[in-house]
Every structure is written in structure tokens, then in C-alpha cells.
Amino acid sequence: SKTADNVVAVPEGEVLSIPMPPGTNDLRHEIELVACLGRGGRNLTLEEAQEAIWGWSVGIDFTVADQKLPSGGRDMMRSKVFERSAPVSFVKPAYRTPLPNPVDLWLYVNNQKRQAGSTSNLVLSPYEQIVELSRYFTLEPGDIIFTGTPNGSSTLAVGDMIDAGVNGIGSIKVKIVENA
């Protein structure tokens, strides 16, 4: 989960600066295809889930992997919810960009490939994920759903330049900077 203010749009060709969250030595990246809903609903069918998607985006889900609770478990709130932890590309309307199956995702750090994979390797397709989510809560127009990441998530450092994309959808660039 992310809060709305964690999401930030990255214009194509620009580089977004992301401050290293305080108190971490283990900031990680996850490239993901993002489904952007134009319609909501509850208990959607597969066909309704497909029709609910207004567009597609590229997203990076940043996670602080070393935030612990006093009891020893991972603090999921501080791990996932921090400034600019969910950069996304501008949305490509689904009617102009039909989602091929499968879709390839990739992420480079300092020009070295860290993640590469396909939506065919996800446990549930993006559409099936929307169906499943709608069983548990009402989806709303404007919701964005990060749909999963390939293997290869790794630790980032200040100064790292990340170039990530989803074939047919777009790409984004971000740089990890000192926290002011």
C-alpha cells in the first residue's frame, strides 16, 4: 500500500530525484506495470476488470527493506510509505495501447540490468488481480494498481541512476539523492 502523496508522475525524458529515506541501508526497487482504473466496482468479472482499465503506466515500487518493528517483524508502513516511493510514467490510454500478452518489464541501475521479466510470470494476470482485489474492497475510478515485479530487486545507494520501463507502455528515469 502507498498513500496518494507517495505517487509522483515522471515526464518521459526527465529524471526524478528521489531522496534516500532516513535511517535505511536497504532501499530496494521493483519495476511494475501499473493499471489505472477509469471505473470502479466490487466483485468484478474478468470482462468487467478489463473494461475498468482506463490506461497503463510504468511504475517503480520503492521499499525500505530494513525497517523493523520493536517486536522484530518488518514495519510495512515505514517500509512502503515515504516521500516519492511510487514514481510512475504518464498514463497511456488503454484504447490507444492495448495490453499485449505477455508484456516485458526491465530495470537498469547505472546501466547494469537488475530486473527483466514478463507479466506471463506473474501468479495472476493484471486483469485477474483486479478481479481478486474487487472481491475484498470496492475499487474506485482513479485507483492505480501496481501489478507485480520480476526477480532481481536489489539495494540502491545515493547517486544511483535508475532507468526502468515496460515495453509498449514507456519508461521512467530516477536518481537516488541525499535526503536534505
Predicted regions and their residues:
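Short, conserved beta-strand element in jelly-roll/cupin
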Residues: 1, 34-39, 88, 130-131
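Extended, compositionally biased flexible segments
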Residues: 1-31
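Short beta-strand-to-turn element immediately C-terminal to the catalytic PLP-Schiff-base lysine
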Residues: 1-2, 10, 21, 36-38, ...
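Structural motif
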Residues: 6-7, 17, 32-34, 55-57, ...
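A short secondary-structure junction signal
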Residues: 12-15, 22, 44-49, 67-72, ...
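A generic local secondary-structure boundary/capping motif
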Residues: 15-27, 41-48, 76-80, 93-96, ...
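RNA pseudouridine synthases
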Residues: 30-60
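Catalytic-pocket segment enriched in acidic/His residues
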Residues: 63-180
